[in-house]
Amino acid sequence: MILFPAIDLKDGQCVRLVHGLMDQATVFNDDPAAQARAFEEAGFEYIHLVDLNGAFEGKPVNAAAVESILAAISIPAQLGGGIRDLATIEMWLEKGVRRVIIGTAAVKNPALVIEACRKFPGRIAVGLDAKGGRVATEGWADVSDLTVLDMAGRFEDAGVAAIIYTDIDRDGALQGLNIEATVSLADAISIPVIASGGLSSIEDLKKLIAANCSGIEGAISGRALYDGRLDPSEALKLLRGVA
Protein backbone atom coordinates (compact mmCIF):
# COMPACT_ATOMS: atom_id res chain seq x y z
CA MET A 1 0.00 0.00 0.00
CA ILE A 2 1.38 3.41 -0.99
CA LEU A 3 1.25 6.57 1.13
CA PHE A 4 1.30 9.60 -1.16
CA PRO A 5 2.41 12.87 0.47
CA ALA A 6 0.42 15.74 -1.05
CA ILE A 7 1.77 19.01 -2.34
CA ASP A 8 -1.08 21.37 -3.17
CA LEU A 9 0.08 24.40 -5.14
CA LYS A 10 -1.52 27.83 -4.88
CA ASP A 11 0.23 30.91 -6.27
CA GLY A 12 3.50 28.96 -6.46
CA GLN A 13 3.42 27.95 -2.80
CA CYS A 14 2.74 24.70 -0.98
CA VAL A 15 -0.57 25.11 0.86
CA ARG A 16 -3.40 23.17 2.46
CA LEU A 17 -7.05 24.09 2.13
CA VAL A 18 -9.97 23.20 4.40
CA HIS A 19 -12.94 21.62 2.55
CA GLY A 20 -11.43 22.83 -0.73
CA LEU A 21 -12.01 26.53 0.02
CA MET A 22 -9.35 28.71 -1.61
CA ASP A 23 -9.84 31.47 0.96
CA GLN A 24 -8.94 29.02 3.73
CA ALA A 25 -5.40 28.29 2.59
CA THR A 26 -2.53 27.76 5.01
CA VAL A 27 0.94 28.18 3.49
CA PHE A 28 3.24 25.39 4.68
CA ASN A 29 6.22 26.00 2.42
CA ASP A 30 7.02 28.72 -0.10
CA ASP A 31 9.54 26.41 -1.79
CA PRO A 32 7.59 23.43 -3.19
CA ALA A 33 10.70 21.82 -4.69
CA ALA A 34 12.38 21.80 -1.27
CA GLN A 35 9.23 20.27 0.22
CA ALA A 36 9.20 17.55 -2.44
CA ARG A 37 12.87 16.78 -1.78
CA ALA A 38 12.14 16.54 1.94
CA PHE A 39 9.38 14.02 1.25
CA GLU A 40 11.73 11.93 -0.89
CA GLU A 41 14.44 12.08 1.78
CA ALA A 42 11.86 10.95 4.36
CA GLY A 43 11.42 7.74 2.38
CA PHE A 44 8.25 8.39 0.38
CA GLU A 45 8.17 6.63 -2.98
CA TYR A 46 5.48 8.56 -4.88
CA ILE A 47 4.30 12.19 -4.61
CA HIS A 48 0.80 13.57 -5.21
CA LEU A 49 0.71 17.07 -6.76
CA VAL A 50 -2.29 19.34 -7.26
CA ASP A 51 -2.37 22.65 -9.15
CA LEU A 52 -5.15 24.30 -7.12
CA ASN A 53 -5.28 27.47 -9.21
CA GLY A 54 -5.39 25.26 -12.28
CA ALA A 55 -8.36 23.31 -10.91
CA PHE A 56 -10.34 26.53 -10.60
CA GLU A 57 -9.17 28.09 -13.88
CA GLY A 58 -9.33 24.97 -16.04
CA LYS A 59 -5.74 25.23 -17.28
CA PRO A 60 -2.22 24.82 -15.83
CA VAL A 61 -1.31 27.79 -13.61
CA ASN A 62 1.47 26.53 -11.33
CA ALA A 63 3.50 24.97 -14.15
CA ALA A 64 6.79 26.53 -13.03
CA ALA A 65 6.39 25.13 -9.51
CA VAL A 66 5.50 21.68 -10.84
CA GLU A 67 8.52 21.68 -13.15
CA SER A 68 10.81 22.71 -10.29
CA ILE A 69 9.48 19.79 -8.24
CA LEU A 70 9.99 17.31 -11.08
CA ALA A 71 13.58 18.54 -11.48
CA ALA A 72 14.24 18.19 -7.75
CA ILE A 73 13.11 14.59 -7.19
CA SER A 74 13.88 11.14 -8.56
CA ILE A 75 10.67 9.46 -7.33
CA PRO A 76 7.51 9.45 -9.47
CA ALA A 77 4.80 12.10 -9.18
CA GLN A 78 1.14 12.17 -10.12
CA LEU A 79 -0.48 15.51 -10.97
CA GLY A 80 -4.02 16.84 -11.06
CA GLY A 81 -5.62 20.27 -11.43
CA GLY A 82 -6.52 22.10 -14.63
CA ILE A 83 -5.92 19.14 -16.92
CA ARG A 84 -8.79 19.27 -19.38
CA ASP A 85 -7.45 18.14 -22.78
CA LEU A 86 -5.10 15.68 -24.49
CA ALA A 87 -2.51 18.36 -25.27
CA THR A 88 -2.11 19.20 -21.56
CA ILE A 89 -1.95 15.51 -20.63
CA GLU A 90 0.75 14.91 -23.24
CA MET A 91 2.69 18.00 -22.12
CA TRP A 92 2.86 16.85 -18.50
CA LEU A 93 3.76 13.27 -19.36
CA GLU A 94 6.58 14.54 -21.58
CA LYS A 95 7.80 16.80 -18.76
CA GLY A 96 8.17 13.82 -16.46
CA VAL A 97 4.87 13.38 -14.61
CA ARG A 98 4.35 9.64 -14.12
CA ARG A 99 0.56 9.74 -13.89
CA VAL A 100 -1.90 12.47 -14.84
CA ILE A 101 -5.13 12.87 -12.87
CA ILE A 102 -8.24 13.95 -14.77
CA GLY A 103 -10.95 15.39 -12.51
CA THR A 104 -13.54 17.84 -13.82
CA ALA A 105 -12.95 16.81 -17.44
CA ALA A 106 -13.62 13.16 -16.55
CA VAL A 107 -17.11 14.12 -15.37
CA LYS A 108 -17.91 16.57 -18.17
CA ASN A 109 -16.12 14.77 -21.00
CA PRO A 110 -15.73 11.03 -20.25
CA ALA A 111 -14.58 10.44 -23.83
CA LEU A 112 -11.37 12.30 -22.98
CA VAL A 113 -10.52 9.70 -20.34
CA ILE A 114 -11.15 6.83 -22.75
CA GLU A 115 -9.03 8.45 -25.46
CA ALA A 116 -6.24 9.36 -23.01
CA CYS A 117 -6.12 5.81 -21.61
CA ARG A 118 -5.85 4.44 -25.12
CA LYS A 119 -3.06 6.84 -26.04
CA PHE A 120 -1.18 6.69 -22.72
CA PRO A 121 -1.90 3.28 -21.14
CA GLY A 122 -1.20 3.04 -17.42
CA ARG A 123 -0.57 6.78 -17.11
CA ILE A 124 -4.10 8.11 -16.54
CA ALA A 125 -5.91 8.35 -13.20
CA VAL A 126 -9.35 9.80 -12.52
CA GLY A 127 -9.99 12.07 -9.57
CA LEU A 128 -13.50 11.73 -8.16
CA ASP A 129 -14.24 14.28 -5.47
CA ALA A 130 -17.43 13.82 -3.46
CA LYS A 131 -19.53 16.16 -1.39
CA GLY A 132 -22.34 14.37 0.41
CA GLY A 133 -21.72 11.38 -1.85
CA ARG A 134 -22.16 13.42 -5.05
CA VAL A 135 -19.38 14.22 -7.52
CA ALA A 136 -18.10 17.81 -7.41
CA THR A 137 -16.21 19.59 -10.20
CA GLU A 138 -14.54 22.92 -11.07
CA GLY A 139 -12.25 22.90 -8.04
CA TRP A 140 -15.17 21.49 -6.01
CA ALA A 141 -17.28 24.59 -6.64
CA ASP A 142 -20.05 22.71 -8.51
CA VAL A 143 -21.80 19.61 -7.15
CA SER A 144 -23.47 17.30 -9.69
CA ASP A 145 -26.30 14.77 -9.34
CA LEU A 146 -23.94 11.88 -10.07
CA THR A 147 -22.78 9.53 -7.35
CA VAL A 148 -19.13 8.48 -7.20
CA LEU A 149 -20.13 4.91 -8.04
CA ASP A 150 -22.12 6.03 -11.11
CA MET A 151 -19.11 7.95 -12.36
CA ALA A 152 -16.51 5.30 -11.57
CA GLY A 153 -18.57 2.67 -13.36
CA ARG A 154 -18.29 4.61 -16.61
CA PHE A 155 -14.54 4.02 -16.66
CA GLU A 156 -14.60 0.35 -15.69
CA ASP A 157 -13.35 -0.79 -19.09
CA ALA A 158 -11.35 2.28 -20.11
CA GLY A 159 -8.01 1.20 -18.67
CA VAL A 160 -7.84 3.84 -15.92
CA ALA A 161 -4.76 3.23 -13.73
CA ALA A 162 -6.40 4.43 -10.49
CA ILE A 163 -9.31 6.37 -9.06
CA ILE A 164 -8.45 8.95 -6.44
CA TYR A 165 -11.49 9.26 -4.23
CA THR A 166 -11.62 12.40 -2.10
CA ASP A 167 -14.23 13.13 0.54
CA ILE A 168 -14.43 16.94 0.36
CA ASP A 169 -16.35 17.19 3.62
CA ARG A 170 -13.29 15.76 5.38
CA ASP A 171 -10.49 17.20 3.26
CA GLY A 172 -8.03 19.31 5.23
CA ALA A 173 -10.13 18.93 8.36
CA LEU A 174 -8.26 16.00 9.98
CA GLN A 175 -11.55 14.17 10.62
CA GLY A 176 -10.30 10.77 9.50
CA LEU A 177 -10.55 9.03 6.13
CA ASN A 178 -14.00 8.00 4.93
CA ILE A 179 -12.96 4.36 4.97
CA GLU A 180 -16.47 2.94 4.60
CA ALA A 181 -17.14 4.86 1.38
CA THR A 182 -13.66 4.13 0.02
CA VAL A 183 -14.02 0.40 0.64
CA SER A 184 -17.53 0.37 -0.89
CA LEU A 185 -16.16 2.00 -4.04
CA ALA A 186 -13.12 -0.29 -4.23
CA ASP A 187 -15.30 -3.38 -3.78
CA ALA A 188 -17.68 -2.27 -6.54
CA ILE A 189 -15.12 -1.66 -9.29
CA SER A 190 -11.98 -3.33 -10.64
CA ILE A 191 -9.96 -0.08 -10.84
CA PRO A 192 -7.54 0.45 -7.92
CA VAL A 193 -8.73 3.17 -5.51
CA ILE A 194 -6.63 5.71 -3.60
CA ALA A 195 -8.20 7.16 -0.44
CA SER A 196 -7.98 10.91 0.09
CA GLY A 197 -9.43 13.55 2.37
CA GLY A 198 -9.23 13.74 6.14
CA LEU A 199 -6.35 11.41 6.98
CA SER A 200 -5.47 12.49 10.51
CA SER A 201 -3.17 9.94 12.14
CA ILE A 202 -1.54 6.53 12.01
CA GLU A 203 -4.85 5.14 13.33
CA ASP A 204 -6.52 5.97 10.00
CA LEU A 205 -3.92 3.92 8.17
CA LYS A 206 -4.37 1.04 10.59
CA LYS A 207 -8.13 1.13 9.96
CA LEU A 208 -7.56 1.22 6.21
CA ILE A 209 -5.34 -1.85 6.45
CA ALA A 210 -7.81 -3.58 8.78
CA ALA A 211 -10.53 -3.13 6.15
CA ASN A 212 -8.54 -5.75 4.21
CA CYS A 213 -9.65 -4.43 0.83
CA SER A 214 -7.36 -5.53 -2.01
CA GLY A 215 -8.77 -2.83 -4.30
CA ILE A 216 -7.25 0.02 -2.28
CA GLU A 217 -3.86 1.04 -3.71
CA GLY A 218 -3.03 3.55 -1.00
CA ALA A 219 -3.87 6.84 0.66
CA ILE A 220 -2.96 10.51 0.31
CA SER A 221 -1.85 12.59 3.27
CA GLY A 222 -1.46 16.34 3.42
CA ARG A 223 -2.19 18.31 6.55
CA ALA A 224 -1.44 15.43 8.94
CA LEU A 225 2.12 15.27 7.60
CA TYR A 226 2.61 19.04 7.67
CA ASP A 227 1.18 19.35 11.18
CA GLY A 228 3.34 16.51 12.48
CA ARG A 229 0.32 14.37 13.41
CA LEU A 230 1.55 11.61 11.12
CA ASP A 231 5.15 10.46 11.48
CA PRO A 232 6.54 9.52 8.03
CA SER A 233 8.84 6.74 9.22
CA GLU A 234 6.14 5.15 11.37
CA ALA A 235 3.56 5.36 8.57
CA LEU A 236 5.89 4.01 5.89
CA LYS A 237 7.03 1.15 8.11
CA LEU A 238 3.39 0.21 8.73
CA LEU A 239 2.44 0.26 5.05
CA ARG A 240 5.51 -1.45 3.61
CA GLY A 241 4.32 -4.78 4.92
CA VAL A 242 0.95 -4.38 3.18
CA ALA A 243 0.43 -5.35 -0.46
Curated annotation (Swiss-Prot):
Please provide the Gene Ontology terms (biological process) for this protein. Answer: L-histidine biosynthetic process; L-tryptophan biosynthetic process
Pathway recorded for this protein: Amino-acid biosynthesis; L-histidine biosynthesis; L-histidine from 5-phospho-alpha-D-ribose 1-diphosphate: step 4/9
Which InterPro entries does the record match to this protein? Aldolase_TIM, His_biosynth, HisA_bact_arch, Isoase_HisA-like, Isoase_HisA-like_bact, RibuloseP-bd_barrel
| Keywords noted in UniProt | Amino-acid biosynthesis, Cytoplasm, Histidine biosynthesis, Isomerase
Primary localisation category: cytoplasm
Q: Name one Pfam family in it.
A: His_biosynth
Source organism superkingdom: Bacteria
Report what the protein is called. 1-(5-phosphoribosyl)-5-[(5-phosphoribosylamino)methylideneamino] imidazole-4-carboxamide isomerase
- What is the organism of origin for this protein? Parvibaculum lavamentivorans (strain DS-1 / DSM 13023 / NCIMB 13966)
